[in-house]
């Protein structure tokens, strides 16, 4: 069986996804299917041509509709800014194509509700959808999920997490698309937030759930140079940093923090989960390990222990050997393998648009709380 893939948007993430599509057959012994890179689209014609030349796509275009409606394309991979996710998803689902979409799912919470409903209808026709959440697909986080679901934590007391970057500290960094509300829909909360919030909801699914949030946001650098004319500046309308207190259904407490101006950080996604029986901790900058504390052991055995998770992916993952160290790109490869496996073998594709909607709901609640100064209850619609 051969599945044809069309990639829409050939910037950073388009290249990452293309790398993964090309790598899957090598790492999984040809499972679950053959992959054909059919079409690549970018509004920048040079970028589209680079995709055709470098990655071997059959054709390139500046019109995403040509990718969607090509008869050999079964999977539409969306790697464009948030503003255009919705229109591409609508057309792809209507055309009967499976959709793999970068996070966040939509430009807004309202649009996310609409797209999730469309995906539910499309599922009745056998169409699969998945939103990119690559941090679910590290062996360390997969092990954390297994432990959380097994009861290892016991009664949840605390969830703490952060995702910190430093790339926007320079006030002379231009007002690019990630800083423009009309394109991205928000700031760091919609840029980095979906990664950590999805991990939290996924890890604690069936264990506990958020029932209220109290959020704060801040824009530290109020204006930036315009890309087209650096001598002129314009206001920044999105947040540089965001944080939220979370109350869970059981009474457990949570705290999440996001920043693109955290001096000294690179790609710091960290979380800690503490319960009455055990605890877990993970840091993306040390992706080959999961730290665990087992309080059910005798006190003489207490202490955090480092579990080696490296590249311990389940079969049919065959290469490289599980003993070798892990990199960020490998998680994308496994995420996209799982999406193809869901299509070929009719399995659930996760995270789907309903999972992404829950993330959008959390982000919307945090923004509403930050604006009002009050706690906001969940779910938003009862």
How should these model regions be labeled?
Residues 1-55:
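N-terminal Rossmann-like dinucleotide-binding module
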């Amino acid at each position: 069986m051969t599945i044809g893939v069309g990639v829409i948007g050939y910037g950073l993430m388009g290249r990452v996804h293309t790398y993964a599509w090309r790598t899957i057959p090598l790492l999984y012994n040809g499972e679950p299917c053959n992959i054909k890179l059919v079409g690549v689209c970018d509004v920048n014609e040079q970028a589209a041509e680079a995709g055709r030349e470098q990655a071997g796509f059959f054709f390139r275009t500046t019109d995403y509709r040509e990718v969607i409606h090509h008869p050999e394309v079964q999977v539409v991979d969306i790697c464009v800014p948030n503003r255009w996710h919705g229109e591409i998803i609508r057309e792809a689902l209507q055309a009967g194509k499976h959709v793999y979409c970068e996070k966040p799912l939509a430009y807004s919470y309202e649009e996310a509700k609409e797209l999730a409903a469309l995906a539910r209808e499309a599922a009745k026709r056998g169409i699969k959808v998945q939103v990119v959440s690559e941090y679910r697909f590290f062996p360390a986080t997969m092990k954390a999920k297994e432990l959380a679901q097994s009861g290892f934590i016991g009664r949840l007391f605390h969830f703490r997490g952060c995702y910190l970057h430093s790339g926007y500290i320079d006030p002379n960094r231009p007002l690019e698309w990630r800083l423009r509300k009309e394109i991205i829909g928000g700031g760091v909360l919609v840029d980095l937030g979906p990664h950590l919030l999805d991990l939290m909801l996924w890890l604690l699914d069936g264990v506990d759930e958020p029932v209220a949030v109290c959020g704060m946001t801040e824009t530290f650098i109020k204006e930036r140079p315009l890309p087209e004319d650096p001598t002129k500046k314009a206001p920044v309308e999105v947040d540089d940093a965001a944080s939220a207190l979370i109350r869970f259904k059981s009474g457990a407490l949570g705290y999440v923090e996001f920043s693109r101006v955290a001096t000294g950080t690179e790609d710091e996604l960290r979380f800690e989960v503490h319960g009455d029986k055990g605890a877990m901790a993970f840091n993306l900058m040390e992706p080959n390990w999961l730290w665990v504390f087992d309080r059910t052991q005798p006190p003489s055995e207490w202490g955090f222990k480092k579990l080696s998770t490296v590249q311990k992916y389940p079969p049919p993952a065959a290469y490289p050997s599980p003993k070798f160290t892990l990199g960020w790109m490998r998680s994308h490869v496994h995420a996209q393998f799982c999406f193809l496996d869901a299509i070929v073998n009719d399995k659930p594709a996760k995270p789907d648009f309903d999972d992404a909607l829950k993330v959008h709901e959390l982000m919307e609640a945090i923004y509403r709380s930050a604006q009002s100064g009050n706690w906001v209850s969940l779910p938003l619609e009862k």
